[in-house]
């Protein structure tokens, strides 16, 4: 069987994560297919609506996803991985993923708390999967919104089979139990603001791998926010201790 295409989007501001994924992905059963997006496109499309998720109203991800599903069908490729770039990748991804393909699921999502997270997707190249994502796109055209929120809404009408990954083996940084050995971690942020978001993701990544070789790819204007984020964590911890005493 030919390697499974593993697509992820990245832009210059996220080169830090792009280089990490390139160096970390060791499974020969996958073929990495990085999709570089001009930084100007992200600058134009993201953080458009104050007070909303920074992906609100952006079609970048869903349009690329649909394009790659069409391409997979044309090439008789049974499955694709379509993911974000801000990941911690450890050995054993394919063996952990294979069971979902053996069970012939149409779609497999990350589970983040009570909802589906679309940052790491295993997708069967099929018409019903394409129809599902087209439904989400149509919903976004009709009323501007967040693709992930619409994915959770549209799943209720999906006629195929779907499930979620084991939520500790394929985990999110805000739902990991801090003890299970994971193979994928989606590094999330608290949405404190554009610069803080990146700083928080870098800080969280540094808890799991040596990031020093990759700090050369971090923009200089982000560095002060990393230190500030650590200060906020320490402040929050002290406040929590004080509240517990009182």
Model-derived regions: residue spans:
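Catalytic core and acceptor-binding pocket of nucleotide-sugar-dependent glycosyltransferases
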Residues: 130-244
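A short acidic, often aromatic-flanked loop/helix-cap motif at beta-alpha or helix-coil junctions
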Residues: 39-49, 115-116, 169-175, 192-193
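Conserved strand-to-helix beginnings and helix N-cap segments that scaffold or border functional pockets
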Residues: 18-19, 93-94, 148, 196
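Short beta-strand/turn micro-motifs composed of small residues
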Residues: 7-10, 109, 186
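N-terminal anchoring/stem segment of glycosyltransferases
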Residues: 1-78, 125-127, 146, 204, ...
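GT-A fold catalytic core of metal-dependent nucleotide-sugar glycosyltransferases
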Residues: 57-115, 120-130
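A generic structural motif
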Residues: 32-41, 109-110, 145-149, 164-169
